[in-house]
Design a protein with these regions (language model features):
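Loop-to-transmembrane helix boundary motifs in multi-pass membrane proteins
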Residues: 155-163, 202-214, 310-322, 389-421
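Hydrophobic alpha-helical segments and their helix-loop junctions in multi-pass secondary transporters
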Residues: 240-266, 277-281, 290-294, 318-336
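Helix-loop-helix module between adjacent transmembrane segments
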Residues: 131-135, 157-182, 192-225, 248-251, ...
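Flexible loop linkers connecting adjacent transmembrane helices
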Residues: 132-157, 185-195, 229, 233, ...
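Select transmembrane alpha-helical segments in multipass membrane proteins
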Residues: 70-79, 113-114, 130, 159-171, ...
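Membrane-helix boundary/coupling elements in multi-pass transport proteins
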Residues: 82-91, 146, 167-188, 286, ...
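Membrane-water interface regions at transmembrane-helix termini and the short interhelical loops
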Residues: 135-139, 215-235, 287-306, 425
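Residue-level detector of conserved catalytic or cofactor/ligand-binding positions
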Residues: 422-428
């Protein structure tokens, strides 16, 4: 009589390559956690399948959510505060700098306004949309972006590549000093446009500087305590800020849609080399103010996700374009207005609003300036830490004020930046 084969030799899991896990080795808590994970995966799969059944758009959305460019509404809002705070404050001072370089609003004709708008639009398009969004963000180091992440990918090709990487890091640290000073001071200058405070600021010429310095000192003083709790609302505030930019710009643009002719790049090229351009080629320095902070789209890619930047950038660009073109329409409308022809430091951003709306604009602009500064300060801490890891900087004391090690605080860098900001803010 044939011997009955051992049943364990015939079990399916005895001749498969799939690793076996004995349930007897799992604790009750581990089994519950595993069940929760399986339930979450099943729920997500059902959600994607339901979305895919809605047609071509649904199938595209399913592929997107299953890939590396996954979009999350929560992280998209976080991206607004982390990535776009810097570029979002550029409308505060770009048009003001342009008018100053041209000798005032009385010397700024239609050709100059359309030329400037054209240069701004195409600079944002080529530098931010094409260079960073379409090209640079495809070159990542395991999902991370930034100058040092890019250097890590190419360092094996030559030691000399450390030089451009160092220059890029130095440029970012310089931006961490210049941009907060300009953003905060430009926002504080909005107080001058409020009727109840006009006389006060005329009597006290240094009042803007004093308020700016107080904000800077307070901002750097709280760094040692961490900004984790404040950071949660940054994205929502920046969302309100960009919506405000778009609405105010659209209101003024509706009065003169002809400025949309500046979408033609010919206007920008003609103005750049035109004798009407009082600033000459130096006007490009003003133009590039509109792209300040564009590098954050690439450097913060690892923090917020590539897909969330792809998702939010169209809204950001539309809001910026509406605001810049709205300021251009206001300049053309008030070119011959004697009230503005001799006004010192004329800022179209605040002047194009109703006086009652300016109160909201000042509050939002100061808040946006602080958020932009916070993003740059945090980025400076991270960059110095990375440079220290590459032995490019001396080892400095690093603290972790948050519950996680994701947020850094470097005391020496903090106060060097603070003093540098105060020095930059001083009038020349």
């Amino acid at each position: 009589m044939a011997q009955k084969p051992d049943e364990t030799l015939l079990r399916a899991d005895t001749f498969t390559n799939v690793p076996k896990v004995s349930r007897r080795t799992l604790t009750k808590e581990e089994r519950e956690e595993l069940a929760k994970q399986q339930a979450a995966e099943t729920k997500e799969a059902e959600k994607l399948a339901k979305t895919a059944s809605k047609g071509a758009i649904g199938r595209w959305w399913r592929r997107l959510q299953s890939g590396p460019n996954k979009i999350s509404l929560g992280m998209a809002i976080v991206a607004l505060g982390v990535v776009y705070g810097d570029i979002g404050t550029s409308p505060l001072y770009t048009a003001q700098t342009f008018l100053s370089g041209q000798g005032g609003i009385a010397n700024t004709d239609r050709e100059a306004v359309l030329g400037m708008l054209s240069l701004v639009f195409w600079s944002i398009t080529l530098i931010t949309t094409v260079k960073y969004v379409l090209i640079a963000m495809r070159i990542d180091n395991k999902g991370e972006g930034g100058i040092f992440a890019l250097y890590s990918l190419i360092r094996r090709h030559g030691a000399w590549l450390a030089i451009p990487a160092m220059l890029g890091g130095a440029a970012f640290l310089a931006d961490s000093v210049l941009t907060p000073a300009v953003s905060i001071s430009s926002a504080v200058e909005g107080l001058k446009t409020l009727p109840p405070l006009e006389a006060l600021f005329k009597e006290n010429g240094n009042l803007t500087l004093m308020i700016t310095v107080v904000i800077i000192v307070v901002l750097f003083s709280v760094q040692s305590r961490g900004t984790e709790s404040i950071g949660r609302v940054f994205g929502s505030v920046v969302l309100v800020w960009f919506t405000f930019l778009a609405v105010v710009g659209a209101v003024n643009l509706s009065g003169d849609w002809s400025v949309l002719a500046a979408l033609n790049p010919v206007y920008g090229v003609k103005f750049l080399f035109s004798p009407h351009n009082a600033a000459g080629i130096a006007v490009m320095g003003t133009v590039f103010l509109s792209t300040t902070g564009a590098e954050a789209l690439y450097s913060d890619m690892g923090h917020v996700g590539r897909g969330n930047i792809y998702f939010t950038w169209p809204f950001i660009k539309v809001a910026l374009v509406f605001n810049y073109f709205g300021q251009g329409a206001w300049i053309l409308k008030n070119q011959n207005n004697p009230e503005y022809q001799h006004m010192e430091g004329l800022n179209p951003f605040f002047q194009m609003m109703d006086p009652n709306v300016r109160y909201v604009a000042v509050i939002l602009s100061v808040t946006a300036g602080i958020i932009a500064s916070q993003a740059l300060i945090t980025g400076a801490f991270t960059m110095v830490s990375e440079a220290t890891g590459l032995n490019w900087m001396p080892h400095l004391q690093v603290r972790y004020p948050a519950r996680t090690r994701g947020q850094l605080y470097i005391p020496v860098i903090n106060w060097v930046l603070c003093l540098s900001l105060i020095h930059i803010s001083e009038p020349t």
